[in-house]
């Protein structure tokens, strides 16, 4: 009783129409003409499924390539921004070095000046 009951796969997540699934014949015996028509029908169904699969794969490939190129563009833009930040920081370091050197020279000048003033006051 259970052997005659066929369980059909869950087709809720299937994108294809149910008619693409091979149908089980209820008749116990099929003529040779019926068998050749059936195998021709199955072959054309397989060809259709193969074409549909190739189209789906092609579409997915295009979509993946689009996402990868978008990702590469974003990375390129971020790299350009990072490079501009590095250039700006380099400029700030150079400016800080110039100011530091100026302040060191100024301190030495003031030190010499105070030495002269101190020597003058001691005389």
Swiss-Prot record:
Bias-annotated ranges (Low complexity) = 31-41
Cellular location(s)? Chromosome
Q: Mind listing the UniProt keywords for this protein, alphabetically? A: Chromosome, Meiosis
**Top-level taxon in the UniProt lineage:** Eukaryota
Bias class Basic and acidic residues marks the residues at: 7-21
Q: Look up the record and give one Gene Ontology term from the biological process aspect.
A: synaptonemal complex assembly
Which Pfam families has this protein been placed in?
TEX12
**InterPro entries reported in the protein's UniProt record:** TEX12
Tissue and organ expression note: Testis (at protein level). Detected in ovary. Expressed in both male and female germ cells.
Q: Which GO terms describe its cellular component?
A: central element; chromosome; nucleoplasm; synaptonemal complex
Listed under subunit, the entry gives: Interacts with SYCE2.
As for what it does, the entry says: Component of the transverse central element of synaptonemal complexes (SCS), formed between homologous chromosomes during meiotic prophase. Requires SYCP1 in order to be incorporated into the central element.
What name has this protein been given in UniProt? Answer: Testis-expressed protein 12
Q: Which organism is it from?
A: Mus musculus (Mouse)
């Amino acid at each position: 009783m259970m052997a005659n009951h066929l369980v059909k796969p869950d087709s809720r997540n299937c994108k294809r129409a149910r008619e693409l699934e091979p149908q089980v014949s209820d008749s116990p015996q099929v003529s040779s003409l019926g068998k050749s028509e059936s195998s021709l029908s199955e072959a054309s169904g397989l060809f259709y499924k193969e074409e549909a699969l190739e189209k789906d794969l092609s579409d997915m490939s295009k979509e993946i390539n689009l996402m990868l190129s978008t990702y590469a563009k974003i990375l390129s833009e971020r790299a350009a921004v990072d490079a501009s930040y590095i250039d700006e920081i380099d400029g700030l370091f150079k400016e800080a070095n110039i100011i530091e050197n100026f302040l060191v020279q100024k301190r030495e000048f003031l030190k010499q000046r105070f030495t002269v003033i101190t020597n003058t006051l001691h005389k």
